[in-house]
Amino acid sequence: MKLKKITLYDEPTIPEIKISDLASFIKDNFSVDVVIKDNFFLNLNKSEVKSLTKTRIFDIYKKKNLYEPEKHATDFEEQLCKNSLIMEKTTKIEDAENISEVVMYDGFEMQKFLRNQIRDTVNDTLHIIFTNRLTCTFDESDSRYHGRAVICSNPAIISTTGIIEAPAKSKEFYIQAMANKSQGLGINSVKELHKGEFLEYHDERLAKIIEGYILQIIFYNITGETFCEYLDCRLNNAHWQRDLLYSQIEVSKLCKKHQMILDMQK
């Protein structure tokens, strides 16, 4: 795909995105025009909200089948579209007694929904939509949904909640957190013990991390290739927080192969 324009749709409740800086980052690295637009979900009508609600996941072990949403789910989605800050008040994974308490969406179904809404369907334009909704995809290998930070292709989705929740924390963190919970204790002391080892909500490191996901999306749409196997590359699809921070913060560059591809784009 030969790109001429990239449209970024902001998520204003996450100031760490730094959308203007991202636009400059893209223009510094690629010969494309960049347009910034408001939150994609802000002005959906009732019919569109209902369609979006159909992408919700209520059972992580059941592959998504679009359903007729209940009124309370549609009402929630309508309020969320008007004010995405509501998402921050929903149950987080670490606080959930049951995973069904967490608000989740099928990433591919949401992508289909977004594609149907976008009026600008020119082939040389890439749309990247930020959201604090948690996107997930179904993994056939273990027959369940898993959180995802990014859904590539076009339109692409970057889930800020997915960036926090999808890459796993260390095994030590989970063992200690489970031990605390078994004693009826919170996990704040465990989080403090491991502070800096993983991203947290509204983490100042998000801006740098998001640059890497932007690169992954653009490279996928240019080359058709998914991610990079090397940890020393910003295109690496990190499954652990430590690997994410290593690739995006410590290394913060592309491998030789992908740097050569980037150089040809300028």
Question: Residue locations for each model-derived region?
Answer:
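Long, contiguous hydrophobic alpha-helical segments, chiefly transmembrane helices and signal peptides
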Residues: H127-F130, T135, P155-I158, G162-I163, ...
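N-terminal low-structure segments adjacent to metalloprotease catalytic domains
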Residues: M1-R148, L262-K266
